Every structure is written in C-alpha cells, then in structure tokens.
C-alpha cells in the first residue's frame, strides 16, 4: 500500500494522531510520503522518522492508494489540488 499524508495543522494533537497513523501504516508495511510542510511540522514537534515528501507540483502519481488529509473541510478542499486528475481517493481525518 502506498499512502500520501497531508495536513494544515493548527491543533496540537494533529501530530499525535499522525504518529499513531504512521505506527499503524508501518505495521502494514505501507510506503508513506508526507507533504513537505506537514513533514517539517512533524519533525519540529520532536518526532523522528524519515519519510519521503511531496509538494503540490512533485512527488505524487497514480500509484498511490490513498491520500490522507488531516484537518477540516478547507484542508480536504486543498487536498484536491494535490491529487488533481490522479484518481487517488482522499480520506479525511478531522
């Protein structure tokens, strides 16, 4: 399974939930990419782990099985600008 993760976090617990998701995805041997700005927030929180990153213009393709969006409605709407015409399903975590 190949998963992209994106978030615009303004809540402290978003990184906590991200860490939980990463733990579960690791158990499934998933390949995980994290959006570059969200990854910086993850590292700035003191969390560790190396993950490849993506941006709005590079790093995503139609080989991804899922795009996880952390945030509210606006974040999911912005997530659509990442996946565009790639056909990647978006899963929202509010």
Q: Where are the regions that the model predicts?
A:
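A short, Lys/Arg-enriched amphipathic alpha-helix followed by its capping loop at the start of a domain
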Residues: 20-30
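Short amphipathic alpha-helical segments
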Residues: 18, 46, 79-83
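Active-site regions of enzymes building and remodeling cell-envelope glycoconjugates
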Residues: 45-57
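Short internal beta-strands
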Residues: 30-37
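Small-residue-rich beta-alpha loop regions that form the catalytic core of phosphotransfer
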Residues: 11-13, 40, 55-94
């Amino acid at each position: 399974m190949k998963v992209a993760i994106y978030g615009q976090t303004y809540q402290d617990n978003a990184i906590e939930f991200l860490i939980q998701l990463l733990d579960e995805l690791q158990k499934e041997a998933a390949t995980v990419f994290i959006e570059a700005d969200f990854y910086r927030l993850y590292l700035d929180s003191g969390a560790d782990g190396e993950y490849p990153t993506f941006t709005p213009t590079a790093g995503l393709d139609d080989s991804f099985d899922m795009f996880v969006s952390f945030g509210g409605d606006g974040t999911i709407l912005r997530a659509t600008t990442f996946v565009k015409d790639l056909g990647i399903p978006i899963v929202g975590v509010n």
